[in-house]
Amino acid sequence: MSSGKIAQVVGPVVDVMFASGDKLPEINNALIVYKDSDKKQKIVLEVALELGDGMVRTIAMESTDGLTRGLEVLDTGRAISVPVGKETLGRVFNVLGETIDLEEPFAEDVDRQPIHKKAPSFDELSTSSEILETGIKVIDLLAPYLKGGKVGLFGGAGVGKTVLIQELIHNIAQEHGGISVFTGVGERTREGNDLYWEMKESGVIEKTAMVFGQMNEPPGARMRVALTGLTIAEYFRDVEGQDVLLFIDNIFRFTQAGSEVSALLGRMPSAVGYQPTLATEMGQLQERITSTQKGSVTSIQAIYVPADDYTDPAPATAFAHLDSTTNLERKLTQMGIYPAVDPLASSSRALSPEIVGEEHYAVATEVQRVLQRYRELQDIIAILGMDELSDEEKTLVGRARRIQFFLSQNFNVAEQFTGLPGSYVPVAETVRGFKEILEGKYDDLPEDAFRSVGPIEDVIKKAEKMGF
């Protein structure tokens, strides 16, 4: 183990000087520095740059408070390694793989793997196209998710990205019994805490590993915690041959953390102040999230859109890697439609007749056509009123409004707030319900009966209660 000494500390960035004869640590190696003489308080640093003349520049994974010049730094000779395998299920830990759930720490002999790896080679990849049923109508009908694909949940602050992720974890654990890895990147600690207790109560936690690097942590932890979660998911895929779900909330914070340390590392800022290495960092993470011949990793990533601006470099860079996008729209939350998924802006590579089938494709495209025509007619309605529309257009508007409300539904994870039981709707039921609305079977039922319900049978029951 070669050792050096701290030369300077600038926030989360620490420069370490090694003696001229010593071998310099490699890029991404983990270094350890002890803050106290008892060697109880250690800080892990990760090598980011080699500056020459025995000097390396590192990023701290924990707060650098208490570090002083001259403290000894030890090179571990390898990258940060984290626990993997069945032992991680039901547990919560940080970027370094240390448990933070107040239960027993991992045993010393637990399997560990480095967080930095190469992406699978071209011949290892799987190319099958299979739909992952989520039980959420608007997603399954208009922007279905591919098993082993990458999904982006786009939206500004407070439009429901985290709630949608929680519902997906709930539905997939209950209906498919799959393993999930939840990675909290730079989000609210309170939300992580709520999610942990909800999962514990519902029993879902036994099939989930949780990794957190939250808002209050240094940028080094927020930058690397996504790789920690991904390493655990890769183990289940490659060694145990499992189909894994990887949730990342929020991928924007991964970019933001990189931006925070970029200038301190001596890099020139790029567009909008982001790091010049933005596309490379995103690519290195995203290329590892894929399906191989052994198993699949389906990733669902919440992506915060700063000031609702989709041209911002951070969300725009993430767009390039996705198979499906679920766009959350603030206007829909104002109308009380939840989940607030924009049916026209959301898209999926899987929405093709070869993958979803002819009937599903025909119903989905007709739903989009009706909603698009309704959007075009809204200006006329706002200025001249409904009376100026033809009978055919009035019928279309009525159906479009019913479709818009029927795209909403109650969530299981929101039951404690709404007081209404959540619903899981199979794809076949979803397609049938929308097909019947398009055929005009329910033109006589009130629009309100379609709001926040599950399958079409719920609409009929609700209408009967309303006296229709």
Curated annotation (Swiss-Prot):
It comes from the Bacteria. SMART domains: AAA. F-type ATPases have 2 components, CF(1) - the catalytic core - and CF(0) - the membrane proton channel. CF(1) has five subunits: alpha(3), beta(3), gamma(1), delta(1), epsilon(1). CF(0) has three main subunits: a(1), b(2) and c(9-12). The alpha and beta chains form an alternating ring which encloses part of the gamma chain. CF(1) is attached to CF(0) by a central stalk formed by the gamma and epsilon chains, while a peripheral stalk is formed by the delta and b chains. The gene is atpD. NCBIfam families: atpD. Its EC number is 7.1.2.2. This is ATP synthase subunit beta. ATP binds at G155, G156, A157, G158, V159, G160, K161, T162. HAMAP family: ATP_synth_beta_bact (MF_01347). It is found in: Cell membrane. It is an enzyme of class 7 (translocase). One of its GO terms (cellular component) is plasma membrane.
